[in-house]
């Protein structure tokens, strides 16, 4: 049997980290078992579902590279199929029309609450013949009243619900639209889903859905209900903890590999290993290894992973993600070094791509003035001679190579009988406008000969004016 999983978000908001982790687990289980992964949009909540939210979900999935084999399917395009099954169930007696008014239902629940009883439908219309009337009605599933629903969850183990505790679920509303729990069942059946991976908040839906599947004569899939994600203070994850949409992490400068690596470890482990490539995730992932305890979101750990991937991934690939941030910060990269070279130069210190982009601006644009602190320390009178001598050596270079630039710096220091720092630091401030950069020879090489000469001239003028003032 081919393993087939699905991710079925509701387009009522962005794809948040909890949903992304569920999608990742479902995707990994399919990929680890040479199976198929289905994307389904559960948009039956017509009031809250929006095209913008749907687009955000698809964009998030694509950015994470969680590719799907089928879909996206939309529940709103399958209403005819749901209604077909509802008619079939009414004819077979596994569903019935309920004419109880909202007032009667509310009164019934109030009385049950006053008696300390479980609040559920009392079956008033369960065994009555359908009325030949225009009265409004809902359609309810005729849930078994005896026995139990039993299933073995990949994460939570053996779970059992007594049928006597389950309601006769509404499967079609008064206006005829099918309900969430019913649509899910028909979709999972029609799409051949063999394993449902979802959040623990769906556990109470599972026995109801299993009973509907059995009433339809449909196979029952396996289930894996994963725990919620908490903030580092133990409270349910919210925006103040960083529970933002997946694309916000892109905007903040995270690589998809870092977020995926972080999310897979939020509840799953393989020994003591912390860093996993996508191929390693597929190789080692198992639903049975997911921890049933809730996991705490730790932004520092995510930042650490992001730093790792910025340094370790192919600079060309990292540069492809950096392009968005350069454009977002209005940095024109058409006149400057290759972005992959910038990534190689700056990756050691960058925590995020957003930070990397901001720190690379001097490679592509001239700066208005020198950093005050750096200039005060390094563009003093003693810097005039090394800057002037190096500029003359720079002008005489026959080839623009890293080695030639490095040799020019060494020769300048040797001729002046000073340490490399006495030459390198003034040059760094001159060429970048600041006191921090990659190795000064590499920085000058990437800035380019014309820009480097212009900026050193500017620094010489700055120092001369300082001497004369």
Swiss-Prot record:
Its main location: cytoplasm. This is Glutamate--tRNA ligase. A motif ('KMSKS' region) lies at residues 236-240. It catalyses: tRNA(Glu) + L-glutamate + ATP = L-glutamyl-tRNA(Glu) + AMP + diphosphate. A motif ('HIGH' region) lies at residues 9-19. Monomer. InterPro entries: aa-tRNA-synth_I_cd-bd (IPR045462), aa-tRNA-synth_I_codon-bd_sub2 (IPR020751), aa-tRNA-synth_I_CS (IPR001412), aa_tRNA-synth_I_cd-bd_sf (IPR008925), Glu-tRNA-ligase_bac/mito (IPR004527), Glu/Gln-tRNA-synth (IPR000924), Glu/Gln-tRNA-synth_Ib_cat-dom (IPR020058), GluQ/Sye (IPR049940). Binds 1 zinc ion per subunit. Catalyzes the attachment of glutamate to tRNA(Glu) in a two-step reaction: glutamate is first activated by ATP to form Glu-AMP and then transferred to the acceptor end of tRNA(Glu). Pfam families: Anticodon_2, tRNA-synt_1c. Its EC number is 6.1.1.17. CDD domains: GluRS_core. It comes from Shewanella woodyi (strain ATCC 51908 / MS32). One of its GO terms (molecular function) is tRNA binding. ATP binds at residue 239. Its cofactor is Zn(2+).
């Amino acid at each position: 049997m081919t393993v087939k999983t699905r991710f079925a978000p509701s387009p009522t908001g962005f794809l948040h980290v909890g949903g992304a982790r569920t999608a990742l687990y479902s995707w990994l289980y399919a990929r680890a078992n040479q199976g198929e992964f289905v994307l389904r949009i559960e948009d039956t909540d017509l009031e809250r579902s929006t095209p913008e939210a749907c687009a955000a979900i698809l964009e998030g999935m694509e950015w994470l590279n969680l590719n799907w084999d089928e879909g996206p399917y939309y529940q709103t395009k399958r209403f005819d199929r749901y209604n077909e099954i509802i008619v079939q169930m009414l004819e077979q007696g596994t569903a019935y029309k309920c004419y109880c008014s909202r007032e009667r239902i509310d009164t019934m629940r109030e009385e049950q609450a006053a008696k300390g009883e479980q609040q559920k439908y009392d079956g008033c219309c369960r065994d009555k013949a359908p009325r030949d009337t225009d009265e409004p009605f809902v359609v309810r599933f005729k849930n078994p009243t005896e026995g139990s629903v039993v299933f073995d969850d990949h994460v939570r183990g053996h779970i059992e619900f007594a049928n006597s505790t389950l309601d006769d679920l509404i499967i079609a509303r008064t206006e005829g639209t099918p309900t969430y729990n019913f649509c899910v069942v028909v979709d999972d059946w029609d799409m051949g889903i063999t394993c449902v991976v979802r959040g623990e908040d769906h556990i109470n839906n599972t026995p109801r859905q299993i009973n509907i599947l059995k009433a339809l004569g449909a196979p029952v899939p396996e289930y894996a209900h994963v725990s919620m994600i908490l903030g580092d203070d133990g409270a349910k994850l919210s925006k103040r903890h960083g529970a933002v949409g997946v694309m916000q992490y892109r905007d903040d400068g995270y690589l998809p590999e870092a977020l995926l690596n972080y999310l897979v470890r939020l509840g799953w482990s393989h020994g003591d290993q912390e860093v996993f490539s996508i191929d390693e995730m597929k190789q080692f992932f198992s639903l049975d290894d997911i921890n049933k305890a809730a996991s705490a979101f730790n932004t520092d750990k995510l930042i650490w992973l992001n730093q790792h991937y910025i340094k370790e991934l192919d600079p060309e690939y990292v540069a492809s993600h950096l392009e968005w941030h350069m454009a977002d910060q209005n940095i024109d990269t058409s006149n400057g070094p290759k972005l992959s070279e910038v990534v190689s130069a700056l990756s050691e210190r960058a925590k995020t791509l957003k930070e990397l982009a901001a720190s690379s601006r001097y490679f592509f644009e001239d700066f208005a003035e020198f950093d005050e602190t750096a200039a005060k320390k390094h563009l003093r009178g003693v810097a005039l001679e090394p800057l002037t001598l190096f500029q003359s050596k720079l002008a005489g270079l026959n080839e623009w190579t890293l080695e030639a630039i490095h040799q020019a710096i060494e020769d300048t220091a040797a001729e002046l009988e000073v340490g490399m720092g006495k030459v390198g630091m003034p040059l760094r401030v001159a060429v970048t406008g600041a006191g921090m950069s990659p190795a000064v020879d590499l920085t000058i090489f990437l800035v380019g000969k014309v820009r480097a000469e212009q900026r050193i001239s500017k620094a010489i003028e700055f120092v001369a004016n300082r001497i004369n003032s």
